[in-house]
Amino acid sequence: MAAAKDVNLFGTDGIRGHVGQHLTPQLALQVGFCAGLELGQDASPHQPFILGQDSRNSSDMLAMALSAGLTAAGLDVWHIGLCPTPTVAYLTHHTEAVGGVMVSASHNPPADNGIKFFQANGTKLPPTTQGKIEQRIRAYSQQQPSGTWGHHFHRPELTKSYTDAIQTPLHAQVDFQGLKVVLDLAWGAATQLAPAVFKAMGAEVICLHDQPDGDRINVNCGSTHLAPLKAAVNLHEADVGFAFDGDADRVLAIDCQGRTVDGDYILYLWGKALQQQNQLPKDLIVATVMSNLGFELAWQQQGGTLLRAAVGDQNVHAEMLNHGSMLGGEQSGHILCPHYGVSGDGLLTALHLATIICQNKTRLSCLVDDSFQTYPQLLKNVRVEDRDRRRNWQECQPLQTLIDQATDDMGDQGRILVRASGTEPLIRVMVEARDMRMVNHWTDQLVRAVETHLA
């Protein structure tokens, strides 16, 4: 079989694309084989590789193709089946596996899918390793099978060690008796594990979008569409609602007043709890350039320091390692706390936020009221199909001129962020300022410029 023509496969969060066009079973086979050879260079015969997947119709097909490639590379595959991405990261780290892989496109539409690898310590592959896998794919026709074939094993029972690990330490401190929780499972990867864990902790659980059919993952539900969760929290008079994305590596919350509690609020509340327990070195949190200025100022008033990384949990993780931080994350709900897990984990984060609510014997709405006021912020996405234009948007002089004008106009009362998405064909425009009129004005101007000169 010929090698994949496009060997720049890895984006900011693995390989992702439209199934049948950018992502095919043939490509998945090549990727599995080449990743198996690269990550399994020093592996013992039949050393395992962890494989998980979300609920998309294409996930079975791609998982089987990956498994064929991995077993051809001489590795045994432990197929966990439907599970959150953090489950794969955890099991990769806590078993003898040489690596792990998750088939999911996270929050993307059902027609997309993706392949996300983990190294033996449970963290995502560094760019250097991704580059080596791409080099192997480039020379795919010259790659030779290992001569020792691996085997494919169904191992869904392994998820219990993951749920025990995230649940047991918290259950020793608190139970969720009296807490009414609504879970929006986005017809995705958390549909089996999240309700079971919350019920085991003692919560009353109401589930939304918990019967995946393969066609509707993330469609008008989950962390990218919060309206159903807000309505359900109000209808059931719940204490809190949690919305996961398709692979459950992120979570957003809704309080009893229907307000969105995003990653900034979660970082502030979790950071404050860790600070009070003397478990937050240097009182340092790593956020991203997308985090709200109101959060940063409030955390400074709390005696802490907020560092900003580029967007992407890998960038957050790198800054956390560089500065010795034990808490970091993104406004979108990717939260990292190395003391409890090696990757962003929506279910783990939801459990800790629920624990903070119960330990404070109050409602999430009260905790939010006592935290900070956000600056008005508006984020708009503009679809730009041309890949080169997306990557090189900074070379667009009319857009740069407009950004300079807006920056001068707002001064220290606001900020602008324009960036290309690493996972979708989008240019993202974010404007933040004290004055909402200023936010609306400059957002409209910038979006119009992107549409005119790039789209």
UniProtKB/Swiss-Prot annotation:
Q: How is it modified after translation?
A: Activated by phosphorylation.
* Coiled-coil regions, chain positions: none
What note does UniProt attach to the cofactor annotation?
A: Binds 1 Mg(2+) ion per subunit.
Family statement: Belongs to the phosphohexose mutase family.
Return the NCBIfam families for the record. Answer: glmM
The entry's function note states: Catalyzes the conversion of glucosamine-6-phosphate to glucosamine-1-phosphate.
This chain belongs to the protein called: Phosphoglucosamine mutase
List the gene name. glmM
